[in-house]
Amino acid sequence: MRIFLTGTMRAFYMLGFAAMASRILPVVFAALLAAPAGAQTLLRISTPAVPDDWHVKMLYVLRDDLAKSAPGRFEVQVHHSGTLFRQGAEVVAMQRGNLEMALLSMQDIARQLPEYSIFTAGYLIRDPAHLRKVWGGPIGDEARRRIAQEMGIELLQVVYLGTRELGLREPRPVKTPADLAGLKLRMPGSKEWLFLGQALGASATPLAFTEVYLGLKTGTIDAQDNPLPTLKSAKFYEVTKQIVLTGHLVDSLQLSISAKTWGALPASDRDAVKKAAAAAAKYNDDNRAREEKELIEFFRGQGIAVGTPDVEAFRKTVQAAYLKSEYAQKWPRGLLERINAVK
């Protein structure tokens, strides 16, 4: 090295650039000394959520947290509105190494591991607090290990999506599933969704989301089910006179990272990602819970009757229907009872 530098400096002097060399070489050496110890990790995150959704906003919380805790270690790219991968395609993209992170639904996971369809069943999860306790305890640990081993995907944090409630075009007394007999309840068109509608005691009717508003207005359907924020954003409340807080599906997403990406990270970077994911999930969960509470008062202000039925009666009826179904045959023995026992 000394000979090379001496030769180089001699060449500079011979060309009359001694002064230039004295300025350039210190800069070069300083740059080499300042270079990061490892390469920057690219984290592309895919979600179908739109920019105003808390799920997108939480991903920027994750990005900003990593920028502070691990400066220069990550390049986080948030791809919202399904612009990078369409909803449902993220799992395969992660497994093929084409995507680092995503917000995955349990429906996505259950397509490859059918036993986890249990997490898509009605009245499995009681509320957001129960959701966090289930996934924060042994049940969640077991699921994460199996999903990582079988699918090559690490689940970092469970994220609250929303609680589905019933919105009726005309008011009626609703306390138990028997009170929904004959009610034309719009559900998404898959057999799993229609099964849930029937289990609630209603006459489940498939209808495209874009047709729900007109269906409620004209009486093609009597009711629909969605989280409260959707009732507002889709303006369903304009053609709704009663909201029944059945809470029949406390839905969630999993903030996930590919096992390949995770395995390549040093321990310090893993810790940074875990902490950033926890901060992002808390940001989302707190804001969604607040929004749902505020919306109840908003709907009441619109003249809509909002009430709570006998939720335990609904839970027992729906869970009994699931236990007799083809879906329950794929659930791990005893898992339903373990989830119900989490307090």
Regions found by a protein language model. Name each.
Residues A35-A39:
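Sec/Tat signal peptide C-region and signal peptidase I cleavage site
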Residues I3, L32, V134-G136, I339-N340:
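Short, Φ-rich (hydrophobic/aromatic) sequence segments
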